[in-house]
A protein has these predicted regions:
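Residue-level marker for buried hydrophobic side chains located in beta-strands
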Residues: 49-51, 109-113, 153
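Short acidic, glycine/serine/threonine-rich loops at helix termini
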Residues: 61-65, 84-86, 121-125, 163-169
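Proline/glycine-rich low-complexity loops and linkers
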Residues: 4-36, 40, 126-176
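Gly/Ser/Thr-rich loops at beta-strand to alpha-helix junctions
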Residues: 55-60, 117-118, 159-161
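Short gly/pro/ser/thr-enriched loop/turn and capping motifs at secondary-structure boundaries
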Residues: 78-82, 119, 137-138, 161
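Gly/Ser/Thr-enriched, mixed-charge loops and adjacent short helices
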Residues: 1-105
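Glycine-rich phosphate-binding loop
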Residues: 1, 102-124, 129, 172-176
Length: 176
């Protein structure tokens, strides 16, 4: 990541030389473009009963724009202190409230986002956690075979090599 090099540079006591040219900041509102991108993949989910744990994170900025009022939501308010649970759905105790919500509402699927909304994980209608590897394989199959799209499949570094082996014959190029 380069953090080790930065640490060494700081600890070495070398002088920090200011940049010759000052940078600038440009404010951009990309929400509309991002939503348009996401919504082009949304099918008709009206028959699905969805339970959703937004983990008090960044997904709260867009979940209602995509899913509307249909899902049963928990922890939808953005709060960087994450008062309800750590926003890491790979830790099973963080998924317990979603599992309860799925059972209480009779949902077909439970959806949980991590804090910065770059990962989403699922539980089934019986509140069983679905392996992220399985979801990558299913989604990869959908995009490669059903939609005929080509390109990289981005996966977590912890993902099984079996996912890439499954998707490679369909044209999937894995990227960790």
């Amino acid at each position: 990541t380069g953090l080790g090099q930065i640490k060494e540079w700081i600890e070495s006591g070398r002088e920090c030389v200011p940049a010759a040219v000052r940078g600038s900041v440009h404010q951009m509102d990309i929400k509309a473009d991002y939503l348009a991108f996401l919504l082009k993949y949304k099918g008709d989910w009206s028959s699905l009963k969805i339970a959703m744990d937004v983990s008090n994170g960044m997904a709260s900025l867009f979940v209602r724009d995509i899913f509307g009022d249909q899902p049963a939501y928990i922890y939808e308010e953005m709060d960087g202190r994450f008062p309800n649970h750590e926003p890491n759905p790979l830790i099973q105790k963080n998924v317990e409230d979603l599992k309860k919500l799925v059972a209480e509402t009779g949902a077909d699927i439970g959806v949980i986002f991590d804090g910065d909304a770059d990962r989403v994980m699922f539980v089934d209608e019986n509140s069983r956690f679905i392996s992220p590897d399985l979801m990558i394989a299913v989604l990869g199959h959908y995009f490669l075979e059903e939609r005929g799209e080509k390109g990289y499949i981005h996966q977590d570094i912890r993902s099984s090599k079996a996912v890439g082996e499954y998707l490679a014959p369909m044209g999937g190029v894995m990227n960790t």
